[in-house]
Amino acid sequence: MSRIGKMPIPLSNQAKIEITDTDLTVTGPKGKLHQALTPQVIITQEDGVVTVQRIDDSKKAKAMHGLYRVLISNMVEGVTNGFTRKLEIAGVGYRAELKNDFLALTLGYSHMIYFKAPDEITIQVPDQTTILVTGIDKALVGQVAAKIRSFRKPEPYRGKGIKYEGEVIRRKEGKAAGK
């Protein structure tokens, strides 16, 4: 039995789950999420707890067992609390600002970079060196944060660029002056 897959998923009072043969819908105060289901897993709901079981012990069913348990858990967490990813900008003259619905980034290139987030994602810029990516879908929040980070990844010599909060940049030593 999968260590992750066998754990039950507690439902909060605010989250409601609807299960059909082919898909699953989780609704909460922050929104609604859908997930297509695979025939390798059986999902049941009783007494405010959702459980995931697999139909057999095939390799595919074992993989799907843990995966769907975590996906459903993330959906419940997302519609009740939401997810936030914080990005930090380091570098002289590097900054971010919101212009209309676009995130405008000045990252040392000869031009500004404009980024439009998907409708399900909210981007906030509390100050010029901090970006908050918020939404109910954990995968989409992470994907948007990774896309923003990819515009100027942190470089190892000075650490300039966009990094996740708490990310440790492995630093390199510069060339030693030879004599």
Swiss-Prot record:
Keyword Ribonucleoprotein among record annotations: yes
InterPro entries per UniProt: Ribosomal_uL6-like, Ribosomal_uL6-like_a/b-dom_sf, Ribosomal_uL6_a/b-dom, Ribosomal_uL6_bac-type
Domain of life: Bacteria
Pfam families in UniProt: Ribosomal_L6 (PF00347)
GO molecular function: rRNA binding; structural constituent of ribosome
A single GO cellular-component term on record: cytosolic large ribosomal subunit
Protein's UniProt keywords contain RNA-binding: yes
Gene Ontology terms describing biological process: cytoplasmic translation
Keywords: Ribonucleoprotein, Ribosomal protein, RNA-binding, rRNA-binding
Subunit field text: Part of the 50S ribosomal subunit.
Entry similarity comment: Belongs to the universal ribosomal protein uL6 family.
UniProt function note: This protein binds to the 23S rRNA, and is important in its secondary structure. It is located near the subunit interface in the base of the L7/L12 stalk, and near the tRNA binding site of the peptidyltransferase center.
Protein name: Large ribosomal subunit protein uL6
Originating organism: Chlorobium phaeobacteroides (strain DSM 266 / SMG 266 / 2430)
Lineage: Bacteria, Pseudomonadati, Chlorobiota, Chlorobiia, Chlorobiales
